[in-house]
Amino acid sequence: MPPYQIRWLERPEEFERAAEVLAEVWGMRDLRDTIPGHFMRAIADNGGVVLGAFDERGRMVGVLVGILAMDRETGKIYHYSHMLGILRDLRYSGLGYEMKLFQREELLKQGIDLVMWTFDPLRGPNAKLNFSKLGAVCRRYYENYYGELRDELNVGEVTDRFKVEWWIKSNRVSKRLAGEFPTPPLE
């Protein structure tokens, strides 16, 4: 994988570009369907994480957006990782994994030990990243979680989702990330 710079977004134009990248990744024809740049700025400045990945020419090729969250039942504070998008020409390159590792390091600095997010259980590459590479676990399944979405990746599909937990301080996750917790064969 070529070298990419992963860093926090800082300038208004970077947040606006991040909104465009997310729209491109999901095939959102209407920018109202993505997270607005000004809202990403508010997220980044108030406990959330907004990261960009840049290629050697300075082109933004990936975006990760997450917010500080709290479980309503238990009061547990965690990080909710809402969107991770990589431009199509770099999908499956390992960049998404690198962005999640960067996110983990930043959250550990904040004292966060739990990250949660949803994903479509029928998308195999996402399942491999989340379970096999990152070591996330799933305890919840939601039928039609988002309702009808208009982006190209989800239009006309039911939005069933797994909600995964990534315990970023756990020994199991540390071993998975270090390659000491082998993925069982599918045979």
Language-model features, listed with the residues they occupy:
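A short, well-structured alpha-helix characteristic of acyl/acetyltransferase catalytic modules
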Residues: 1, 11-24, 173-187
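A conserved beta-strand-loop-helix scaffold within acyl/acetyltransferase catalytic domains
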Residues: 4-88, 106, 120, 142
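Conserved acetyl-CoA-binding loop-helix of GNAT-fold acetyltransferases
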Residues: 92-107, 126
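Conserved GNAT acetyl-CoA-binding A-motif
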Residues: 107-120, 130
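Conserved catalytic-core motifs of GNAT/GCN5-like acyltransferases
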Residues: 118, 128, 132-154
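C-terminal "cap" of GNAT-fold acetyltransferases
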Residues: 144-177
